[in-house]
UniProtKB/Swiss-Prot annotation:
Entries under Pfam families matching the protein: IPPT (PF01715)
Enzyme class, first EC level, given as a word: transferase
EC number: 2.5.1.75
Protein name per its UniProtKB record: tRNA dimethylallyltransferase
GO biological process, one term: tRNA modification
Higher taxonomy: Bacteria, Pseudomonadati, Pseudomonadota, Gammaproteobacteria, Enterobacterales
Protein family according to the UniProt entry: Belongs to the IPP transferase family.
Subunit structure: Monomer.
UniProt-annotated site: Interaction with substrate tRNA, residues: 108, 130
Length: 316
């Protein structure tokens, strides 16, 4: 696309970053200055009743800066990158039609990628193939199927944990139906995002600082009633660890504690470690991201001013 045709597209802002990096605070600050409306890009914040463990913006923050695509699914429901792209495009069109600018804020990098590049059509689920995979898992175990996936599709196998039957089953199913691996199918993207996008990533300058913030925030969540929040989900009786909602960082570890599998101290340790691992994956994604402007979360005023400097011209 030429620079001229790009310039004629509506504007959008991406504000990406690892967990606990101050994305929400910066987005709320920017909304006071720029004609933006916020869209959440987070696979955990979509769930109702999961507020504390996801660090969902509180009522006061949402009053100051409403976020779209929050609380749109029950924890029993799935939500794919394709679902997100469809919903985000609809919200972006609505915001643009009102003469304002979509500001997409969050840390689910797969969602940002799907939105920016489009999605390749994957084969539809096949009940017979799925049943065959599940039967094999029942007989041999999911670790055996993970080894099989390593031989077929080592790239997907590296991304999928052996204890993640939903994603593991889907990766194998896609190969058995199409004869192609997930990376092969996703190399050809669908429709690119029809917006002129300014992309920012915010993070602390040092990994140690981010680790400290993650640990502090996890303890703050516990002090704010995180255990009671998960107990309420646990008591429903229809939720389990195969669901994406309960596999969210923090929730999975608290669930193991409530099931009596680990001690409270072990839950805290694992929760902090899992959150740090999530942040590491997010930063790895962002380091390979093209055209991103990095911001230092320890200098919030400077970060705000840098965004304004880059996008200020579009505010009028």
């Amino acid at each position: 696309m030429s620079d001229i045709s790009k310039a004629s597209l509506p504007k959008a802002i991406f504000l990406m970053g690892p967990t606990a990096s101050g994305k929400t605070a910066l987005a709320i600050e920017l909304r006071k200055i720029l004609p933006v409306e916020l869209i959440s890009v987070d696979s955990a914040l979509i769930y109702k009743g999961m507020d504390i463990g996801t660090a969902k913006p509180n009522a006061e923050e949402l009053l100051a800066a409403p976020h779209r695509l929050l609380n749109i699914r029950d924890p029993s429901q799935a939500y794919s990158a394709a679902d997100f792209r469809r919903d985000a495009l609809a919200e972006m069109a609505d915001i643009t039609a009102a003469g304002r600018i979509p500001l997409l804020v969050g840390g689910t990098m797969l969602y940002f990628k799907a939105l920016l590049e489009g999605l390749s059509p994957l084969p539809s689920a096949d009940p017979e193939v799925r049943a065959r995979i599940e039967q094999q898992a029942a007989e041999q175990g999911w670790e055996s199927l993970h080894r099989q996936l390593q031989e077929i599709d080592p790239v997907a196998a590296a991304r999928i944990h052996p204890n993640d039957p939903q994603r593991l089953s889907r990766a194998l199913e896609v190969f058995f139906i199409s004869g192609k691996t997930l990376p092969e199918l996703t190399q050809t993207s669908g429709d690119a995002l029809p917006y002129q996008v300014h992309q920012f990533a915010i993070a602390p300058a040092s990994r140690e600082l981010l680790h400290q913030r993650i640990e502090q925030r996890f303890h703050q969540m516990l002090a704010s009633g995180f255990e009671a929040e998960v107990r309420a989900l646990f008591a429903r009786g229809d939720l389990h660890t195969d669901l994406p909602s309960i596999r969210c960082v923090g929730y999975r570890q608290m669930w193991s504690y409530l099931e009596g599998e680990i001690s409270y101290d072990e839950m805290v340790y694992r929760g902090v470690c899992a959150t740090r691992q999530l942040a590491k994956r997010q930063i790895t994604w962002l380091r390979g991201w093209e055209g991103v402007h990095w911001l230092d979360s320890e200098k919030p005023e400077q970060a705000r001013d840098e965004v304004l400097q880059v996008v200020g011209a579009i505010a009028g």
